[in-house]
Swiss-Prot record:
SMART domains: Ribosomal_S15
InterPro entries to which the protein is assigned, alphabetical: Ribosomal_uS15, Ribosomal_uS15_bac-type, uS15_NS1_RNA-bd_sf
Role, per record: One of the primary rRNA binding proteins, it binds directly to 16S rRNA where it helps nucleate assembly of the platform of the 30S subunit by binding and bridging several RNA helices of the 16S rRNA. Forms an intersubunit bridge (bridge B4) with the 23S rRNA of the 50S subunit in the ribosome.
PANTHER family named in the record: RIBOSOMAL PROTEIN S15, BACTERIAL AND ORGANELLAR, SMALL RIBOSOMAL SUBUNIT PROTEIN US15M
Protein's name according to its UniProt entry: Small ribosomal subunit protein uS15
Species classification: Bacteria, Bacillati, Bacillota, Bacilli, Lactobacillales
Length: 89
């Protein structure tokens, strides 16, 4: 199931850097994290759903690249983001 518009707007409002911010790294990573967590729950129930597993791996790779970019450019924002999302780095 894809993320609902309401949930996505809620995440954007929480992690946006300014009014109307929809594309900052923080917002993208937060949305990807929600989607990854949702897909993880799906994969636990449907172990043989390989297409969803592949999509999950692509989202994890995209999030990893965005986090690496953020760490390279602004370490303080990176640390705040991983702390607020509860990621293990």
């Amino acid at each position: 199931m894809a993320i609902s518009k309401e949930k996505k707007n809620e995440i954007m409002a929480q992690y946006a850097r300014h009014e109307g911010d929809t594309g900052s790294v923080e917002v993208q990573v937060a949305v990807l994290t929600w989607e990854i967590n949702h897909l993880n729950d799906h994969i636990k129930q449907h172990k043989k759903d390989h297409a969803t597993y592949r999509g999950l791996m692509k989202k994890i790779g995209r999030r990893r690249n965005l986090l690496a970019y953020l760490r390279r450019t602004d370490v303080n924002r990176y640390r705040e983001l991983i702390h607020s999302l509860g990621l293990r780095r």
